[in-house]
Amino acid sequence: MTEECGEIVFWTLRKKFVASSDEMPEHSSQVMYYSLAIGHHVGVIDCLNVAFRCPLTEYEDWLALVEEEQARRKMLGVMTFGEIVIDASHTALLTRAFAPLADDATSVWQARSIQFIHLLDEIVQEPAIYLMARKIA
C-alpha cells in the first residue's frame, strides 16, 4: 500500500475469507460459520478496500463543523490513537452528526459527508461490515 503523508485514510471491509489450504469437512464448516456468527475469527482474514482519503488539515476542518460532541470525539480518536474502527454501534450517532453537513448545499463538505453517510448506511444494511480509519503521517 502506498499512502501519501499527512492524511486520514478510511478503509471498508468488503469481504472475508478463511485462510486454509485444507479441505474442510461439512460438519467442521458449520462450526466455523457459527464461530463467525458469534464474533470469533477462526482463521478468517478481513479484506479492506480504501473508501476515501482526506488530508489531515481538511479532516480537522471537516470535524470542526460537527456539533455533536460525542461523534466529534469518536472521529478525532484517529488523531489521538492513530486508528479508529467504526462499526454498527456507531452508525446512528455518526449519521445524526453528519446529516446537517450532508444536507447543507452550500457546504464544501457536503459531498464528503454524503459519502461518509453512505458508508455508514452500508454498515446498517450489513452489520459485519466496518470502517477503519488510520492516520498516515
UniProtKB/Swiss-Prot annotation:
Domain of life according to the entry: Bacteria
Q: What class of enzyme is it?
A: oxidoreductase
User: InterPro entries given for it?
Assistant: Formate_DH_maturation_HycH
What EC number(s) is this enzyme filed under? 1.-.-.-
Annotated GO molecular function terms are:
oxidoreductase activity
Keywords assigned by UniProt?
A: Oxidoreductase
Pfam families of this UniProt entry? Answer: HycH
What family does the Swiss-Prot or TrEMBL record give for this protein?
To E.coli HycH.
What role does this protein play? Possible component of hydrogenase 4.
Question: What's the protein called, per UniProt?
Answer: Hydrogenase-4 component J
